[in-house]
Amino acid sequence: MRVTATGVSVTIDGTTILDDVSFTAADGRVTGLIGPNGSGKSTLLRCFYRIIRPQQGTVHIGEHDVWRVPARRAGQLRAVVAQDQELDNEYAVRDIVAMGRIPHQRLLERESTADRAIVDEALTRARIEWAEGRRFVTLSGGERQRVLLARALAQNAPVLLLDEPTNHLDIGAQLELLELIRELGLTTVAALHDLDHAMSYCDAVVLLHHGRVVAADDPVTVLTPQRLADVFGVRGATTTHPLTGQPHLVFAAPRSERELPR
């Protein structure tokens, strides 16, 4: 199911955060939202999961305007792994993952046999089934992210929205999580801070700067030396990763303005 933003503008306390933003994330592909801090990545994602309502423009999942459907239906359309989600640390892992079934249940409805099977599958797909009886507080950062991903998978939504999913994780946990997300095959839109992660794991990227779309295409096409200089103020180039053979970004800080591409 495609994800589309059309002419989205957001102003908060007199400051324009997003200015006429449009993009489309293709069905079954991983699309990265990239840009410097303050470029509007997280705000754009929050428009899709109904935290921030655009003053102008629309956001769609498939044919559904996410602000015109009931909250329960919105929860069936997209699952979210947000930054720094607060949870009661005393919850057991399985209980947290089972929360993903709430959009599919009526008020006060108990967990069904089908719900339990879906939770089992989500735990397995996120490779955290071994911890289902553990308390959330006892897990490492990478393990907690897998639990939150499993909860999202339990929603059985066609679209996955991720806001800085590798934040605060060590490098091994980062790579494991990104590999897992790629393997899921879901339509995924992820705000990413690490440009090399975007290069390696995204099918397409949307580059934001000062709340506007600078470019949207495959990572190699978007992350040119000129754009890296203009948007991020660094010297950069695409090379071939010596271990994977895939495109890989390398960076260097400019010693002077003259060293930036013109």
Predicted regions mapped to residue ranges:
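Conserved structural motif at the start of ABC-family nucleotide-binding domains
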Residues: 3-5, 17-20
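The feature captures the beta-strand-to-loop junction immediately N-terminal to the Walker
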Residues: 34-36
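Helix-to-loop junction immediately C-terminal to a conserved catalytic motif
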Residues: 49
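Conserved ABC transporter NBD signature motif
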Residues: 57-68
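Conserved ABC ATPase "signature" region
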Residues: 98, 113-131
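Catalytic Walker B motif of ABC-type/P-loop ATPase nucleotide-binding domains
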Residues: 160-164, 169
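ABC ATPase nucleotide-binding domains
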Residues: 225, 229-262
